[in-house]
Design a protein with these regions (language model features):
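Helix-rich catalytic cores of soluble enzyme domains
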Residues: 1-109, 120-141
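Active-site or pore-adjacent capping/gating segments
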Residues: 104, 113-180
Length: 180
């Protein structure tokens, strides 16, 4: 939804509504429903709004937990999220600025709690030398993991006033109920 230009509220609402449809199909078979919930993985496009993207993933996780509890009572279900940076924000004229865009969007995805991350090469919108761009994208991910240890802390942005405030704004539609 991100590459289509959807805002954060729309991305979250569409993902939850789409997944809720699948849960509705199997609501009468709790064994299958539990397996589906445990194996579900969501993919989100990540834009360039650093704090908003962190809040988006954290907000989605809490809203999805609310939806799950309407179907079955499972505790500690881990919401698996795959994040991929959006090339919607990549520049064709100055592709080296895309390095910064990829790094900040990737870092916001990791701080938001994604389980896996794909970074598009900074030169994916231009022709030539894709191998170099792929290598740099891989190195950025290795920097997150091996140099900054972002994978060692479970919720690095928890307690941040600004991020928590953004989450409360995004969660304004939390009281909406999806019928199981």
């Amino acid at each position: 939804y991100c590459n289509g230009g959807a805002n954060v509220d729309t991305q979250i609402a569409c993902a939850i509504a789409h997944a809720n449809e699948y849960l509705n199909l199997f609501k009468n078979d709790l064994i299958i429903l539990e397996k589906i919930i445990q194996k579900t993985e969501f993919t989100f496009g990540i834009g360039t709004s650093y704090f908003l993207e962190i809040a988006k993933l954290r907000s989605f996780r809490s809203l999805w937990s609310t939806i799950i509890t309407q179907y079955i009572s499972i505790e500690n279900i881990e919401t698996k999220i795959h994040a991929i940076n959006s090339n919607l924000y990549y520049s064709n004229k100055d592709m080296y600025n895309n390095l910064l865009r990829a790094t900040t969007s990737g870092m916001s995805a990791v701080l938001g709690g994604c389980h896996s991350l794909s970074l598009l090469p900074f030169n994916s919108n231009s022709l030539g030398n894709e191998e170099f761009g792929q290598r740099i994208s891989k190195n950025i991910q290795l920097l997150f993991q091996e140099e900054s240890y972002l994978n060692q802390v479970k919720d690095t942005s928890k307690g941040s006033y600004y991020v928590e405030n953004l989450i409360s704004i995004i969660n304004k539609f939390k009281n909406l109920s999806f019928d199981p």
